[in-house]
């Protein structure tokens, strides 16, 4: 069976196909079949196996030929997108050259996931190293954040022709494309290369599409379709598909028609939700700035306002270029209110940065007296909350020097010890075992051709550590292994982990009980991504039921009330930058969430999973959309809702085939006929325009009914 996605029959054909695949999955789960397909059925979750089969099956055709070139794998964070993509890469590597594009910090994640997958595929084998090396040689890695990404792609495969392209954290690519002011950026060059590539298959992995703006959908689905499926200009996209008055999607039915067949979604199913820990309601701590902090904050706001006024009007008459968000031309010069946002976290009169001195060094040289509630009410509030946590704690800040490093100094002053992996153990075999020995913890690291290194960690000391974008991958891996050790269930080895945006990407953490987000961001998906580092499938399985919860906190700096009311009326800013970012994020989140709901409705598994609002059309074999989006908006919607019902009908045999019919006065010629569709395993109506319709009428009227 070959399905073409621009066809009203595609949704029902896909639903029927996935039902067959699911039955096959259940059979293979219990079988002793040693074929590769059977091994994958036993290694993968059912929702992964559905996509694995649909994408790799040459007869069905997802991501092939007229069925577009790939899929947006929109699976809830922590559900195994990496394992799914590696499964497809292994199965298709004899046809396509797998190229994996991801931030450099995540490359080791793929290697770890590959080893995990190999162990699942070949549980009867004890030594998986040879198979790992054999399969690893087929893959080529490219760093999404590298300055020479284009050169890396050429080195990896010469071009993207004939490649299976896997892009992890794909939302970063989409945002990079629409934030580009020209075609010289890495993201824009990759977009152009993908659009020009021949015989390419694509997997975009993300748990948060449309995180910044619905316009992110444009580069995503243009690349997946291999043509200009959605309008390139921001204004035209918004005119066609966004109702600015209601802050909601416009012409949603027409947009759904264009997207069907390019999305896989998994995340709402009740049986899957049971595998996650419970996320408790967000606690928002509105923390009043100290007088000195608020004074410095107001000075920073004066500078930012002056910069804003100096540049105002420079871009007002410039319409956004193709694939550009409005204002992307000047975004690189914007401060994003960095000064005031950092001061909202920490402000000290003692902090001075000398010439040629790094900010982080200046923070380290500050005396203990600089780290008080007066300099950072936010951090002091956070530390009080952390002391209530019965298990490991994750802290996130976008800011490293005046965010995470300041928190680290506060923790050291409170008696916490910083654990730095490379100072703990020399590099070894990447295998870490932890053993309890009385009141101490012994960490052992086995070198391949050398001695075993051991460090005794006192269980009386509470430790923290940091993962930022500057940390080496081997350090990052070691920290993750220590955190996920069975002996760290309640934070005995690492109680607190501090992460930045780059550092948090791809982390797969267990046992976490609290998440602290030190400052709000206008992109609420960022907060979801941070929480998803510890809210994952199976992450809390080792804990008793009452401990399978995660409490998130968000800290918002508000004005010092006494000083605020002393400012002349009319000169005050009614809301702090923290408050404005939070409110803007909620407003933008409403629109982005509505578009993400559309993606779920267009997902190929939607009807199979029994979700509501799925795109399901009467299978008339008509085109779902016109290639010209403006003309498409003017045409009637060819997708007529599919209604399944039992009806009383008479049987008729004609030319060796069975049909059913009803006498219906409301129909022009007085009859409604039905024929069996083996693809969807149901009877569908024969339209009066079908030549068979007249023949059946004559057959009935001739009195030859069965």
Swiss-Prot record:
InterPro entries: Helicase_ATP-bd (IPR014001), Helicase_C-like (IPR001650), P-loop_NTPase (IPR027417), SNF2-like_sf (IPR038718), SNF2_N (IPR000330). GO terms for cellular component: virion component. The keyword tRNA-binding does not apply. It is an enzyme of class 3 (hydrolase). GO terms for molecular function: ATP binding; hydrolase activity; RNA helicase activity. It is found in: Virion. ATP binds at residues 75-82. It comes from the Viruses. This is Termination factor NPH-I homolog. It comes from African swine fever virus (isolate Tick/South Africa/Pretoriuskop Pr4/1996).
């Amino acid at each position: 069976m070959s399905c073409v996605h621009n066809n009203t029959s595609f949704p029902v054909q896909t639903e029927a196909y996935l039902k067959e695949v699911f039955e096959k999955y259940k059979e293979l789960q219990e079988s002793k079949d040693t074929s590769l397909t059977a091994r994958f059925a036993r290694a993968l979750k059912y929702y992964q196996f559905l996509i694995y089969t649909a994408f790799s099956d040459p007869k069905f055709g997802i991501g092939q030929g007229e069925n577009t070139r790939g899929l947006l794998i929109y699976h809830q964070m922590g559900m195994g997108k990496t394992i799914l993509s590696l499964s497809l890469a292994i199965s298709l590597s004899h046809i396509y050259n797998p190229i994996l594009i991801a931030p450099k910090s995540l490359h080791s994640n793929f290697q770890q996931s590959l080893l995990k997958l190999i162990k699942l595929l070949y549980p009867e084998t004890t030594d998986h190293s040879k198979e790992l090396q054999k399969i690893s040689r087929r893959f080529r890695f490219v760093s999404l954040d590298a300055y020479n990404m284009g050169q890396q792609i050429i080195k990896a495969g010469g071009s993207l022709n004939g490649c299976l392209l896997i892009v992890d954290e794909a939302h970063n690519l989409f945002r990079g494309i629409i934030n580009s002011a020209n075609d010289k950026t890495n993201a824009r060059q990759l977009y152009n290369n993908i659009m020009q590539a021949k015989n390419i298959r694509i997997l975009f992995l993300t748990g948060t599409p449309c995180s910044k703006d619905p316009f992110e959908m444009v580069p995503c689905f243009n690349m997946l379709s291999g043509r200009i499926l959605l309008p390139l200009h921001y204004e035209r996209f918004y005119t066609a598909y966004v109702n600015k008055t209601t802050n909601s999607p416009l012409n949603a039915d027409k947009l759904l028609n264009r997207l069907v067949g390019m999305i896989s979604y998994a995340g709402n199913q009740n049986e899957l939700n049971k595998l996650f820990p419970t996320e408790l309601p967000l606690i928002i701590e509105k923390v009043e700035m100290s007088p000195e902090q608020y004074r410095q904050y107001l000075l920073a706001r004066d500078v930012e306002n002056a910069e804003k006024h100096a540049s105002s009007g420079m871009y007002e008459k410039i319409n956004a270029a193709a694939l550009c968000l409005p204002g992307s031309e000047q975004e690189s010069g914007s401060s994003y209110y960095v000064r005031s946002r950092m001061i909202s976290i920490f402000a000290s009169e003692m902090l001075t940065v000398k010439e040629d001195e790094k900010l982080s060094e200046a923070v380290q040289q500050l005396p203990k007296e600089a780290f008080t509630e007066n300099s950072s009410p936010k951090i002091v509030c956070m530390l009080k909350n952390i002391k209530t946590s019965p298990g490991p704690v994750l802290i996130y800040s976008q800011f490293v020097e005046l965010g995470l490093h300041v928190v680290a100094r506060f923790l050291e002053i409170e008696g916490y010890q910083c654990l730095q992996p490379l100072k703990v153990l020399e590099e070894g075999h990447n295998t870490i075992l932890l053993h309890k020995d009385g009141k101490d913890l012994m960490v052992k690291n086995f070198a391949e051709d050398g001695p075993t290194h051991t460090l005794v960690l006192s269980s009386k000391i509470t430790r923290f550590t940091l993962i930022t974008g500057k940390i080496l991958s081997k350090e990052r891996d070691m920290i993750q292994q220590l955190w996920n050790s069975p002996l760290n269930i309640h934070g005995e080895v690492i109680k607190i982990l501090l992460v930045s945006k780059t550092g948090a990407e791809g982390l797969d953490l267990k046992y976490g009980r609290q998440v602290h987000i030190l400052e709000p961001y206008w992109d609420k998906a960022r907060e979801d991504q941070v929480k998803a580092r510890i809210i994952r499938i199976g992450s809390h399985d080792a804990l008793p039921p009452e401990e399978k919860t995660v409490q998130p906190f968000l800290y918002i700096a508000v004005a010092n009330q006494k000083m605020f009311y002393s400012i002349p009326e009319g000169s005050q800013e009614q809301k702090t930058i923290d408050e404005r970012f939070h409110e803007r994020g909620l407003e933008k989140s409403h629109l982005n969430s509505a578009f993400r709901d559309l993606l779920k409705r267009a997902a190929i598994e939607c009807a199979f999973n029994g979700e509501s609002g799925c795109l399901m059309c009467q299978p008339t074999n008509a085109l779902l959309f016109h290639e010209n989006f403006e003309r498409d908006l003017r045409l009637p919607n060819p997708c007529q809702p599919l209604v399944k019902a039992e009806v009383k009908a008479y049987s008729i045999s004609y030319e060796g085939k069975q049909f059913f019919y009803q006498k219906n006065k409301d129909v022009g010629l007085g009859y409604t006929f039905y024929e069996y569709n083996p693809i969807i395993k149901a009877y569908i109506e024969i339209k009066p325009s079908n030549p068979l319709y007249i023949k059946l009428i004559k057959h009935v009227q001739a009195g030859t009914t069965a």
